[in-house]
Amino acid sequence: MNMQWVGASMMLLIPVLFFLGSLTNERRANWNLASAISLLGLFLSMFLGIAVYFEWVNLSISGQWVGVSKMSLVMLGLVCFIAFVNVRYSSAYMAGNVDEEKRYLRWLMVTLGCVVTVIISNHMLVLMVAWIAISLSLHRLLVFFPNRQRAVLAAHKKFIFARVAEACLLGAILILYYEHGTWFISDIYQNVSLSTSLTTLDQFAAMLLALAALVKCAQLPLHGWLIQVVEAPTPVSALLHAGIINLGGYLLIIFAPLIVLSDMAQWILLIVGGITTVLAALVMMTRTSVKVRLAWSTMSQMGLMLVECALGLFELALLHLVAHSCYKAYAFLNAGSEVESSMKRRLSRAVAPSVKEWWFAGIMSAAMVVGLIWLADLSGPYSPWLLFAIAVTLLIAERRGRLTSSSVIGMVGLGVVLLVVYTLQKNGASLIVSSMETSVGWKGDLWIGFLLVMFMVGYFLLRYHSEHIWMRKVRRAFYAGFYLDEWVTRLNLRIYPTRLPVRFKPKKLQVPKEELFQ
């Protein structure tokens, strides 16, 4: 028996089960079946991972509609795990709404089936159809509460932006088929890997892929819908932030050889993704709503993931994708408990580190990172190590935080542990997806380094000098996201207007006095 076909059949079984599960909710929502399908998908992906490790399944065979690869297996296991947790949470969240939970579970299972189809597809047309289907089915979940104006407006904007991303992806797919004469992603990956340069059409296809990823990941200025969809049910937000919005990064990873040979695609990702990373992180510091803060955090994290892809650090992008998905699923599903802890942090007074503490933290973090680079003889882009050094600097300098106070030795030790764990995880991810040398070189490193320095300046001003008169206008601008979404929304509604639900206004409700005082 051909184990390659067995593995492909097992992977194909997972989306089929999700689609069939969406059809079993005519009388009542079958939550147990949905949980069982998600759990079965997780077990099948784990079994296939073991089969690949022991070489029972050959990964080198191309020309199949279903792609069995290490990358697809990791993503498949991740999506099925998120699906299982989401379904279990949703069963309690939607309890008591008999008619609504049937509709909710039906579209949830369809969305999950489409996401899995994108992940396992090795055929570009199948990928395209499933990519479109994700957007359409997710739209039904985003407008689950059709009487909420913000939710309807966000879904409307997302609907338009999704069409833009799909147009870019379709253009890239047609160009790649014209250039390489095949619809299979694995064949294109192999052909481009053997090349040292791209044709003009391939360059254009890489640019379209980069634009599709930027729009899919809600990068500035097409980001507003991601902030406003928090009006949707909480598990929908968790699914969106943990398993759907990061598909832009997945798209770049599966077309990695094409991206690293295109200077224009890399610089588009570096500029837009880098600016989004810094601005979204600073805007997040000014917001008070837990869900809105998480949404801005997702924008920043997606921007950083796209920057990693532009620098050729695809193993780091994969690690980032998996870690972000697990964290955001937990954060959104635990948003209710986060409100209390967030309130405590805001009510407690932060102790500003002294100049000596900042110098000590900076020297210690720099020594850790430089020592590791020297001992392990590491090469490649150094801006990620600069980012890690900044994170450890903040960890050590702000050890006397809002709620807790830790010793210097403890924080330095924690920094060393984080550095070791990060290095081990990065090396582990390189066994699945390897990094590639890009043409941006030191220029890309310099650009990201400049943005990180600007982030530190903004962080210091917003955190420790936000009460100054001259900082209030700056903070107000950050809080509003520099009004970028307002301009985009106006343009959006002018080009493609929509009718929003009418709000219920009790003050204008005319009630006769006889009925009012009965």
Swiss-Prot record:
Keywords: Cell inner membrane, Cell membrane, Membrane, Transmembrane, Transmembrane helix, Transport. GO terms for cellular component: plasma membrane. It comes from the Bacteria. Disruption phenotype: Cells do not grow in low DIC levels, increased carboxysome content. Decreased ability to accumulate and fix DIC under DIC-limiting conditions. This is Probable inorganic carbon transporter subunit DabB. Signal peptide: none annotated. Its main location: membrane. Part of an energy-coupled inorganic carbon pump involved in transport of dissolved inorganic carbon (DIC) with downstream gene dabA (Tcr_0854); has been suggested to be a proton-DIC symporter. One of its GO terms (molecular function) is NADH dehydrogenase (ubiquinone) activity. Forms a complex with DabA. InterPro entries: ND/Mrp_TM (IPR001750), NU5C-like (IPR003945), Transporter_DabB (IPR046396). The chain crosses the membrane at residues 3-23, 37-57, 65-85, 114-134, 165-185, 207-227, 242-262, 264-284, 302-322, 358-378, 379-399, 403-423, 442-462. Belongs to the inorganic carbon transporter (TC 9.A.2) DabB family. It holds the Pfam family Proton_antipo_M. It is a multi-pass membrane protein. It comes from Hydrogenovibrio crunogenus (strain DSM 25203 / XCL-2) (Thiomicrospira crunogena). Intracellular DIC accumulation is sensitive to CCCP (carbonyl cyanide-m-chlorophenylhydrazone) and DCCD (N,N-dicyclohexylcarbodiimide) and therefore likely driven by either proton gradient, ATP, or both. It is found in: Cell inner membrane. GO terms for biological process: ATP synthesis coupled electron transport; electron transport coupled proton transport. Induction: Induced by growth in low levels of dissolved inorganic carbon (DIC) (at protein level).
